[in-house]
Amino acid sequence: MQQKQMNIELRSKTGKGISRKLRSADMVPGVVYGKGMDPMAVSINYRELQAAMAGEGGQNNLITLVGGGSLDQSMAIVADLQRDAVKGTYKHVDLHRVNMSEKLRVTVPVVLKGTAIGVKEGGLLDFAHHELHVECLPGNIPDHIEIDVTSLAVAHSIHVGEIALPEGVKVLDNPKTPVVSVLGRVKEEAEAAAEAAEA
């Protein structure tokens, strides 16, 4: 988990017109919410928001908020980020103020390590789930969860319940769900034959 710092400004005015003006000034409109507080409208410099999400942790980076009155020195993560459908630029951000002693739920990417022995034997790697839902303290949010697939043979899978997790991290997905598998040639040929028959 990476820790970042980001300046924020409180804003009293909201609405589409105000949001457009902020974006034209290279600012991103947003809101900060959390347990025991009313949502607070804020604005953030576009480049600062980019920097706060830089690195492998992305939206799960733990951010120290600077400024914003009572929000100053609060810890937060990016809960939701809206982007322009065409340009991909940031339109609005939701920041979740967290309590460092209370667990929260986040989505963490899965990273595969090594080359499966089944692939070397001609099988096809099927990476079915690229993310896992986990619960942990904010300070324990992993940048990613690594799975070593080196010994994964043809017609075998690694399921959620078999993954080694970092200390203090609990996975919420069904433990029987296959995350990565190696499909064999026989299965591929059967699927191809079935598709040909349907056609």
Swiss-Prot record:
One cellular component term from this protein's GO annotations in UniProt: cytosolic large ribosomal subunit
Specify the superkingdom.
Bacteria
Question: Among its keywords, does the record have Glycoprotein?
Answer: no
A Pfam family found in this protein is Ribosomal_L25p
Cited function:
This is one of the proteins that binds to the 5S RNA in the ribosome where it forms part of the central protuberance.
Q: How does it assemble?
A: Part of the 50S ribosomal subunit; part of the 5S rRNA/L5/L18/L25 subcomplex. Contacts the 5S rRNA. Binds to the 5S rRNA independently of L5 and L18.
Q: What is this protein called?
A: Large ribosomal subunit protein bL25
Q: Which gene encodes it?
A: rplY
